């Protein structure tokens, strides 16, 4: 099992340290490979007033402290080719956002680094069209594909478990299930995205039972006070229960 978990965006060293320490404790209990995630810039905002984050310089400096003190691997996302050089010496995994999953130059540049490349599958993309994304990843150290829900009308996402099964059976790369973004309601709150975190535990159990072994969860001590993605983020206090269930329902393929 592998779990990627952390806040939507990096807020401060103290904040990320608290989250990373608790997530690592829970994952270590089960012998799960843990990766801390956080964004330095949330470029894809519903509104011009949406909070973007503290920036690359502060985030990468704090990430180095996290890595040194907690001995955790790190993931962050990039939105342009030039951002890759800002992060590649610090993080272990470079993430391509879902809305940029077809951007050839961005994918190929990320694949030239020594980092693993995690590509979020766009909400608009069919599972069988992932082969086009993978055709752009030659030379990568490793590639992961992350499922984060499928568009189902306005402001609505659904989880297509048959699509996840197709990707597990078809592609020779890890398929990560992003549980918390799958319960998002994009733009659903007018000037920000909505969501419903109460669906997270059930979706995590279902994915584990069907053979998913890689999970992505955004967590926060006080999600309703988070600068972004609060409605779909998991309470940090609930993280252990969800991970316990993932282990309990795990199906060995």
Residue ranges: model-predicted function:
Residues 7-15, 34-56, 219-233:
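Glycine-rich, proline-tolerant flexible connector loops at the mouths of alpha/beta enzymes
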């Amino acid at each position: 099992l592998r779990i990627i978990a952390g806040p939507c965006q990096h807020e401060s060293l103290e904040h990320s340290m608290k989250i990373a320490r608790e997530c690592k404790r829970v994952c270590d209990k089960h012998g799960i490979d843990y990766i801390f995630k956080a964004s330095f810039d949330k470029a894809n905002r519903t509104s011009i007033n949406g909070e973007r984050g503290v920036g690359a310089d502060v985030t990468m400096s704090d990430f180095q402290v996290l890595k040194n003190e907690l001995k955790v691997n790190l993931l962050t996302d990039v939105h342009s080719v030039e951002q890759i050089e800002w992060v590649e010496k610090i993080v272990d995994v470079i993430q391509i956002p879902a809305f940029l999953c077809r951007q050839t130059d961005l994918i190929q540049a990320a694949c030239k680094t020594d980092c693993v490349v995690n590509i979020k599958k766009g909400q608009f993309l069919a599972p069988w069209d992932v082969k086009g994304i993978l055709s752009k990843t030659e030379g990568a150290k490793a590639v992961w594909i992350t499922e984060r829900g499928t568009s189902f009308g306005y402001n609505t996402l659904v989880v297509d478990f048959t699509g996840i099964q197709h990707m597990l059976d078809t592609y020779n790369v890890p398929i990560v299930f992003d549980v918390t973004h799958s319960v998002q309601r994009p733009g659903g709150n007018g000037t920000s995205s909505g969501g419903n975190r109460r669906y997270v535990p059930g979706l995590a159990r279902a994915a584990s039972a069907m053979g998913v072994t890689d999970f992505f969860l955004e967590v926060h001590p006080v999600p309703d006070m988070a600068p972004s993605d609060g409605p779909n983020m998991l309470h940090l206090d609930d993280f252990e229960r969800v991970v316990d269930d993932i282990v309990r329902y795990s199906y060995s393929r």
